[in-house]
Amino acid sequence: MQERHTEQDYRALLIADTPIIDVRAPIEFEHGAMPAAINLPLMNNDERAAVGTCYKQQGSDAALALGHKLVAGEIRQQRMDAWRAACLQNPQGILCCARGGQRSHIVQSWLHAAGIDYPLVEGGYKALRQTAIQATIELAQKPIVLIGGCTGSGKTLLVQQQPNGVDLEGLARHRGSAFGRTLQPQLSQASFENLLAAEMLKTDARQNLRLWVLEDESRMIGSNHLPECLRERMTQAAIAVVEDPFEIRLERLNEEYFLRMHHDFTHAYGDEQGWQEYCEYLHHGLSAIKRRLGLQRYNELAARLDAALTTQLTTGSTDGHLAWLVPLLEEYYDPMYRYQLEKKAEKVVFRGEWAEVAEWVKAR
């Protein structure tokens, strides 16, 4: 039975999106997991805690005996059924626990007794995690071009269309602004970093990559922060700035934040609840920058937002949102971005409309 235990093996697993049956407890999985992993634990959180306490008080033999006692009979059979189904569904997969120790070996031996030979990751999640961290450090050393521009400039789409682009906001499940949340919850910090490492490894493996194309992000994207090694390299990177007409930016923002988000919320929750979630999403975004807008201006824009939502609900038109979106861009977002860009003006190497920047990046 082949087992994976070298750095290259670990990288190959991440590049291939090899299915990983992660037998750690749910609390461990939630703290950090690999992108292609599914959590089918040997022990649940309470069982793991009990075994851990027993280990500290009575030693390894007593803890092992307790573990076998807790995971027995119908409980063991239910978990065996889940592992067996996952193995059959993912014949190229691999088992994983925290460090490649007893848990994955126990599950492997039980599966073997049931007629299923399934490999495991020697070193477990810890080894994969260290591989992900090291890969990011190494790959971040390649040259980087950042795509900058005011809100609504289509930066994310431009990055997505580059073969050497990595969509940081897509990986973080957040668009990086007060209105940036998506319907997908953000990953834990470790899981986000693992996903980023896997994406960089896959992108690098597909081609003879000379440089990265990334969006000009701040350190935080929602609740996730960029790995320091990558963030440091981004502060030194060249910047290409998209400068599209204001009207085109408004069209993009209308599509992204009003039409698409309304569709996504109603698709996920149904018409009535979806509408309420959509309204709450917009109000939450505006409320997040209340202090910077000042109370009076915030109240004015919030009233315009309410009026726009009433119009959208009764007519289906999103045009009313321009009454609060335009001043929000002109008074807050655009001045803020231009101020930030001025501080790194020496890094700007190209300016142009979206298509011009895309062509410039393609020629790098």
From Swiss-Prot:
It is an enzyme of class 2 (transferase). Keywords: Selenium, Transferase. Residues 14-137 form the Rhodanese domain. Changing residue 97 to S: In vivo, abolishes 2-selenouridine synthase activity. In vitro, reduces activity by only 50%. The keyword Transferase applies. SMART domains: RHOD. GO terms for biological process: tRNA seleno-modification; tRNA wobble uridine modification. Involved in the post-transcriptional modification of the uridine at the wobble position (U34) of tRNA(Lys), tRNA(Glu) and tRNA(Gln). Catalyzes the conversion of 2-thiouridine (S2U-RNA) to 2-selenouridine (Se2U-RNA). Acts in a two-step process involving geranylation of 2-thiouridine (S2U) to S-geranyl-2-thiouridine (geS2U) and subsequent selenation of the latter derivative to 2-selenouridine (Se2U) in the tRNA chain. Belongs to the SelU family. Monomer. This is tRNA 2-selenouridine synthase. It comes from Escherichia coli (strain K12).
